[in-house]
Amino acid sequence: GDKTNREGLAAKLYFRNLFGSDFIRFYDDSVNNALNYCYQIIKSSIIRTLSIYGLNTYLGVNHKSKVNNFNLAYDLIEPYRAIADKYVYALVKDDNPELSFELRRQLINILNYPVICENKKCSLEYSIDLLVKSYVKTISSGEVNLSFPKLIE
């Protein structure tokens, strides 16, 4: 665990640098609601892909909550959070905490967002498939070679 709360402090600085000095994570505002919605879309895609590959979503590596059925999805979403943050930053322009239909439609489209994975341009959704496939290969071979997505500069 993070007994000194360094992860929390780093997150606070990161979000304030990205969204402004007044930003507080988990407030009921447009940015937080869009972030939560976007993370949920990605997590749902990860859960679906894990299930397709026959993996038990309960058995996480770093996340090990007894009441969370999706620990593994929470592990695998981490490299996607910065991509979602950048995506939300570019989309959310108002302070209305209610997410409009149009904004939700645009947020769902993150699954088509272009990223680099295995040195090729692909959709974020396809990169999830590549990450899960590489995780399965890591489990079976014992050699860690995970296919993480990268932002396109």
Where are each of the predicted segments found?
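Active-site helix-to-loop segments that bind/position phosphate- or nucleotide-bearing substrates
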Residues: 1-153
